Structure formats: structure tokens, C-alpha cells
Amino acid sequence: MKIRGFEVVTKYKNAGINIPKRSTEHSAGYDIEAAETVSFAPGEIKLIPTGLKAYMQAGEVLYMYDRSSNPRKKGLVLINSVGVIDKDYYNNPDNEGHMFMQMRNFTDEEVVIEKGERVVQGVFMPFLVADGDENQEKEERTGGFGSTGA
């Protein structure tokens, strides 16, 4: 039985995508790489594809955090500060659960992220819900990136 982890989405099956791994024994984060080379003009915001989807258990979430070296070395920041990948994003009908990294170039020069370059760290975590949450009506996920809000 699969508990939690990463899989390559169909579109990238033959693209040489690496399954994320932890760099050291005590690392919390799994290094997630760019699936394609992406160029950023000064000030530009773009989505970098990972070629990956993540599966996990109920009551768990995958947080995607910016690598600490990105602002200093690349001039890039994860624009939403933390990416939140919910359990029901996996295999959604819109994009198969393909995870993207939304980055912004805050420099005055073009910045390039190469295919295979580590961009964010994924950390699996349990989460809690508020009292009465089980009594609130929930919608079923029907879309992909950014589909649960405006």
C-alpha cells in the first residue's frame, strides 16, 4: 500500500523527471526540480512545472517551501510564500495533480531556471481541523492549480 510520495504525471513520463529525495538523513524537505527550462524577464511571474504529482493519506498535506538560496543566488521567490498541495489534488480531472512552482523574478535581469534544477522543498505534514468542521458542507475538487478559490 502506498502511503505518501511522488509520481511522474503522464505528460512527463519519458522526460527524465527525478523523483524528489531528501538530501541528508535529517532533512525535512524533498528537493523538487524544474521539469523544463524556464526563463523569467525582470519582474515576471511564471509557473515552473515539476512534472510530478503527490499522494498522501487523509489528514496530511504537502507544503512546498522556497529554497533558502533562491532569493540570494537566483533573484527568485516563491510568490505565494508556501505552496499547499492537498490530498484531493492528486489525480484531479483538470491536470492529473501536476504540481507547479509559482515564482517571481525580482531582479532587473533575465533569470533562467534549468531543467533538473532544484527550486523548492516539499514537506509532508499532518494538519488539524477546527471544531464543527465535520458538520460543514464540503465541495468536491473538480479542478487543478488554483481551483479551490478565486
UniProtKB/Swiss-Prot annotation:
Pathway: Pyrimidine metabolism; dUMP biosynthesis; dUMP from dCTP (dUTP route): step 2/2. One of its GO terms (molecular function) is magnesium ion binding. Transmembrane segments: none annotated. It comes from the Bacteria. Belongs to the dUTPase family. This enzyme is involved in nucleotide metabolism: it produces dUMP, the immediate precursor of thymidine nucleotides and it decreases the intracellular concentration of dUTP so that uracil cannot be incorporated into DNA. This is Deoxyuridine 5'-triphosphate nucleotidohydrolase. The gene is dut.
